């Protein structure tokens, strides 16, 4: 029991920082909203899911975390060693920014490649969609929806992102912190309910308008814009769709589905698994078994 309590306490600083940053985004959302009069009830449900994510994810990461350590020990400290110090030789004032700001952008760009395919699989593989659908059930998209995420998603990302990145790159703690910070802030930004069109930068860096299309249930937007930071991956792999001028569509699940209770949504992947386990066999195999009886 003490381990459980210690784990929850360890998440409190991250939760505090998260909600303070979300609060600042909320102020901006009130000033320049993309969607006016969002439901306070919906925003409250986002907050509940945020808390459940921060509380449950550390427990879900215990086994995957051990696998990351094992892979790192097996393959060493990364196959790719990036060193940009030569670019700033003799320019002391540029050395720190290059090492700690520019250098992490390289693995961040590659991480987005892995995220693109992870995200695409979440939409194409039914078993992965059962947990990811919670994120898309947000009918009022705002910064809080960034962590309206099922606790199962984080351990799954270990296999599609963390381990591949750990094998490829050797990054120090400072660079790793910058990467994590950048990803978190980008997540808040792209989900924010703010009317900030990027204009010519739209296909270069992901923004709220472009990501809003990904959350749209409209057929023309479905299964589009998977990248989290750099739309180039969607452009290269044929899943990019640009927003029309002034286009800020409604968001939510396709086919008019709506989210259920918090408890139901968190248990939903296991509900689906249980139903499949109880579903009678069908098809040729079932026919043969029926004939044998």
Please provide the spans of the model-predicted regions.
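A membrane-cytosol interface segment of integral membrane proteins
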Residues: 248-293
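Short, strongly hydrophobic alpha-helical membrane anchors
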Residues: 1-12
């Amino acid at each position: 029991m003490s381990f459980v309590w210690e784990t929850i306490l360890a998440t409190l600083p991250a939760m505090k920082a998260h909600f303070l940053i979300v609060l600042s985004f909320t102020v901006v959302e009130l000033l320049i909203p993309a969607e006016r009069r969002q439901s306070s009830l919906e925003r409250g449900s986002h907050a509940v899911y945020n808390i459940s994510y921060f509380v449950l994810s550390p427990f879900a990461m215990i086994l995957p975390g051990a696998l990351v350590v094992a892979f790192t020990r097996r393959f060493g400290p990364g196959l790719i060693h990036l060193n940009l110090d030569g670019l700033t030789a003799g320019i002391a004032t540029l050395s720190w920014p290059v090492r700690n700001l520019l250098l992490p952008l390289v693995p961040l760009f590659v991480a987005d490649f892995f995220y693109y395919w992870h995200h695409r699989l979440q939409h194409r593989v039914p078993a992965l969609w059962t947990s990811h659908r919670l994120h898309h059930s947000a009918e009022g998209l705002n910064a809080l929806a960034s962590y309206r995420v099922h606790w199962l998603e984080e351990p799954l990302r270990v296999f599609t992102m963390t381990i591949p990145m750990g094998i490829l790159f050797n990054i120090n703690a400072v660079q790793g912190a910058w990467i994590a910070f950048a990803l978190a802030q980008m997540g808040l930004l792209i989900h924010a309910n703010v009317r900030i069109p990027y204009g010519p930068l739209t296909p270069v860096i992901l923004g709220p308008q472009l990501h809003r299309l990904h959350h749209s249930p409209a057929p023309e937007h479905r299964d589009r814009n998977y990248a989290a930071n750099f739309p180039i991956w969607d452009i290269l792999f044929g899943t990019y769709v640009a927003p029309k001028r002034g286009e800020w569509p409604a968001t939510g699940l396709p086919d008019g589905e709506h989210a259920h209770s918090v408890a139901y949504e968190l248990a939903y992947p296991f509900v689906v698994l249980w139903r499949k386990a109880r579903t009678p066999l069908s098809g040729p195999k079932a026919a043969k078994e029926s004939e044998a009886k």
